[in-house]
Amino acid sequence: MANTAQARKRARQSVQRNKHNSSLRSMLRTAIKRVRQSIATGDKAAAGETLRKATSVIDSVADKNIIHKNKAARHKSRLAAAVKALA
């Protein structure tokens, strides 16, 4: 239990940050799943469009330090390679 006003405030902030970060991580996972689903259908145009949107989400999450920049680069690289392989 937080004993000081500062500790109570930090506990509140931690809960708020946790909710926000969880939301962003969920958004990231959803974007990646959408790209994989469009790749599975074999539609190169749809896959390219979902990849573009997912890249934006991945970069946004990495900029906010929710995931490491190298993990973001790895996700983007692998998804782009999978979309390119559809050709």
Curated annotation (Swiss-Prot):
Residues 7-22 have a biased composition (Basic residues). GO terms for cellular component: cytosol; small ribosomal subunit. Coiled coil: none annotated. GO terms for biological process: translation. InterPro entries: Ribosomal_bS20 (IPR002583), Ribosomal_bS20_sf (IPR036510). Keywords: Ribonucleoprotein, Ribosomal protein, RNA-binding, rRNA-binding. Pfam families: Ribosomal_S20p. The keyword Plastid does not apply. The keyword rRNA-binding applies. Residues 1-25 are annotated as: Disordered. One of its GO terms (molecular function) is small ribosomal subunit rRNA binding. It comes from the Bacteria. Binds directly to 16S ribosomal RNA. Belongs to the bacterial ribosomal protein bS20 family. PANTHER family: 30S RIBOSOMAL PROTEIN S20, SMALL RIBOSOMAL SUBUNIT PROTEIN BS20C. This is Small ribosomal subunit protein bS20. It comes from Bordetella pertussis (strain Tohama I / ATCC BAA-589 / NCTC 13251). The gene is rpsT.
